[in-house]
Design a protein with these regions (language model features):
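Membrane/wall-proximal cationic-aromatic binding patches
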Residues: 15-77, 95-96
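A broadly tuned preference for mixed-charge, low-complexity surface segments
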Residues: 27-31, 98-114, 157-177
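N-terminal membrane-targeting segments
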Residues: 8-15
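Membrane-embedded segments
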Residues: 58-148
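Phenylalanine-focused residue identity feature
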Residues: 18, 35, 45, 49-52, ...
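Secreted/periplasmic serine-hydrolase-like ester/acetyl group-modifying domain
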Residues: 137-239
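Short, small-residue-biased leader/transition segments that mark boundaries at the very start
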Residues: 1-6
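Residue-identity detector for glutamine
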Residues: 21, 30, 42, 88, ...
Length: 239
């Protein structure tokens, strides 16, 4: 009876909202739990944050980092950093799935690293760090029978961490077939459970980089000037 109650409770949608301070800290944390989730990103994008998709370069917090620039010059947006070492285009594609509504007709920044372009493509070990079954469910439940979604499903099938009914459902998309009634039922219930976990765990273990951002901002000139910023960049490069 106890296990049945736990399963039933996990399927009940659990709503929560995050404080502005928590979202502010999450935006610069590059936390993989936030990357793989949906709710924190949805609230942030609804509140004017702009997603910055990238990889390891986002981790270098120098005075010219986009989060530092936005802080110093009081931009009307805040960068929301998504990605870290190893988060290549396939992981980023999957990570975007839960925020399509929030990003419609809005701006985003994509930083493309030359190291992404290899003959072997996405490193499976790196992909495993960012793989989100929640976002896989989101993708599958909205996938269309078009070239883009079939190709994405094919690439996801090549990743060892993709297993079980998610893997079977991806094969349906690759073959241009509709999901079965059971697959839709399974994916909807799995998504509901994973969404509840996302709502609960997203605010845990955030890297607090607020002090670091504010410290780096002090190096910048008080008035925004491309010439002055170039000087700061040259000084930083010489250090």
């Amino acid at each position: 009876v106890g296990s049945e109650m736990c399963i039933r409770d996990s399927l009940i949608p659990w709503e929560r909202t995050f404080s502005k301070q928590t979202i502010y800290e999450a935006a610069a944390s590059q936390n993989t739990t936030v990357f793989k989730g949906s709710t924190m990103k949805q609230e942030a994008f609804d509140d004017g944050y702009v997603p910055f998709y990238g990889s390891s370069e986002l981790s270098r917090f120098d005075p010219l980092h986009p989060s530092v620039i936005a802080e110093k010059y009081h931009r009307n947006y805040r960068p929301f950093l998504l990605g870290g070492p190893g988060s290549q285009s396939l992981a980023q594609f999957l990570g975007m799935q839960g925020t399509a509504k929030q990003l419609k007709n809005k701006k985003a920044v994509v930083i493309i690293s030359p190291q992404w372009f290899t003959k072997k493509g996405q490193d499976p070990n790196a992909f495993a760090l960012y793989y989100s079954p929640l976002q896989a469910c989101n993708f599958l439940l909205s996938a269309k029978n078009n070239k883009t979604d079939r190709y994405a499903a094919k690439r996801l099938l090549e990743m060892p961490d993709v297993k079980g009914e998610i893997k079977n459902s991806l094969q349906q998309i690759v073959e241009g077939k509709k999901l079965t009634t059971f697959q839709k039922f399974y994916l909807n219930n799995r998504r509901r459970m994973l969404s509840n976990e996302d709502n609960f765990f997203s605010a845990f273990q955030l890297r607090d980089r607020v002090n670091k951002i504010q410290k780096k901002a002090k190096v910048l000139p008080s008035a925004y000037s491309v010439k002055a910023l170039n000087k700061v960049a040259a000084e930083q490069a010489a250090m």
